[in-house]
Amino acid sequence: MDKSTLKQLIDQAAGRKPADTIIKNAKIVDVYNARIIEGTLAIADSRFLGIDAAYTADNVINAHGQYVVPGLIDPHIHIESANVSPAVFGSLVTPHGTTTILADPHEIVNVAGMRGLEYMVASAKNTALDIKYTMPSCVPAANPTLETSGAVITADEIKQSYDQGLTYGLAEFMNYPGVVNADDGVLDELLVSLNARKMIDGHSPALHGQGLNAYAAAGVHNDHECTQVDEMLDRISRGMYVYLRYGTVSKNMPTLLKGVTPQNARFCCLCGDDLQSVTLRETGHLDESIRVAIQNGIDPLTAIQMATINTAQCTGLSDRGGIAPGLKADFLLVDDLEHFNVNQTFIDGQKIAANGAYLLPTDDSVAGFDDLLETVHLDNFSADQLKLNLTSDKAHVIGLQSISRTQNLVLPVAHDAEGDFHYKPSEDIVKVAVVERHHLTGNVGVGLLSGFGLQNGAIATSIGHDSHNLVVVGTNDADMVVAIDALKACQGGGVAVQNGQVIATLPFVIGGLMSTEPIDSLIAHQKAFNTICHEQLNVTAQFDPIMKLGAMPLDVIPNLRITDKGLVDVTKFEIIDINA
């Protein structure tokens, strides 16, 4: 801002010159005092001027008694989980009142490194949504000896992203054992961020006591992995903010709300983390989180604070989060606070969404990034690579325990004379494998999975958090091979197979993570794919097949996971033998 612009802003705020826009007959949400102010709100040059009945302007908006709410801010979300580009993502969330997100692109960066980040930054320029990226801190998610990622990010790349203005802070530090143990490479990443005065996001499921003290002392600022109230309170008492997650699958917020009090609410923020397109289109984003918070007994103004001013203060976005003179004019209009149905969304004082629709053109181009359309690299795949060597009558089996965590089950399993697994429909145990797809290593980790419900067929996906190797589950090796081959042919996404035939395909050609389909077509195809998996392959009804399979390699969330290197005991961060 230059001197003349500042003078103009001051003159307009003082009423010496007319505003650009006024909103009259408005009920303005004052998030600072948790109250409602009835009056006229003035805006000029993308900034709020103030609230005063004497303001005038050529452009007058009559709110007709609607509430004016600050724009909603999501402090932690993965755009790739919606399987769309950043540009399309903006068109999905802005009609729900979201005006700013802090996005962690660690899915595409795990696949394509800095090239993936550059694509995300380029696509973000094609939406009105303000997207600020945090630099993925753990690529791969944990120790490289546990899995093979498409790229490796070190302190050098993190510094490069800061120096080039590509990122706003350091994304969730999933390698929390590395922080607690003061690993050398981890210290380098932390220091380059601390010295640059960048925010460091957390990820520390079940961490407590002195380990949590060490994590917070290292400069980690927040955590979104709390599942119980005691975890939340532990973090708040250490000066950390807690992000209450309400995603498509992981919905920890209702449980955590039981621990929110007038005394600690200012340290609580709402976040989505992982949200599918169909959820965003049909249910909502932070607007839905606010509704659910209110339904769970949170005062509407407190719920709004948790999606606006709390988040702005937590993330250092001092130019937004409230309706006050000089702040960025991001706001929305709603009829009433309890139901919180967003009628219109404004960013920088301009209306960009109304009545559930995005009002601007959506440019979903991948021009200049054609290399990201071919990221599934795989030699000829055969059933021999899926063989197990079971030497015991009992095996370590991944048990689908909760929304995000798994069990390390020790179960009796049948096997043939050569030691390979023998599937029995009555036992709901199937084979699961992770196939390396980045560097032609030939790595295949094979294990067993319980609770998925699959019968007579196979499902494969290129979404395998966080290194995004291929994940395949099946009742027989032949269908699993067909699924892997089909996934290679479409360059990623999801594939369902039965009796040797592909019965459903869902292509995600951008990095094997995001679709280039029009959004309505994509959502229809996702619904159809899920229906086939549930009705023809008998996948457990409450599971989204791809999201559930995609979490199986996530070797930073307890307890038992599988990667291209084998079974990972997350409590020990080591590869274990399948035989028990």
UniProtKB/Swiss-Prot annotation:
It is an enzyme of class 3 (hydrolase). GO terms for biological process: adenine catabolic process. Transmembrane segments: none annotated. InterPro entries: Adenine_deam (IPR006679), Adenine_deam_C (IPR026912), Amidohydro-rel (IPR006680), Metal-dep_hydrolase_composite (IPR011059), Metal_Hydrolase (IPR032466). Its EC number is 3.5.4.2. Signal peptide: none annotated. Its cofactor is Mn(2+). Gene3D superfamilies: Metal-dependent hydrolases, Urease, subunit C, domain 1. One of its GO terms (molecular function) is adenine deaminase activity. Keywords: Hydrolase, Manganese. It catalyses: adenine + H2O + H(+) = hypoxanthine + NH4(+). Belongs to the metallo-dependent hydrolases superfamily. Adenine deaminase family. This is Adenine deaminase 2. It comes from Latilactobacillus sakei subsp. sakei (strain 23K). The lineage of its organism: Bacteria, Bacillati, Bacillota, Bacilli, Lactobacillales.
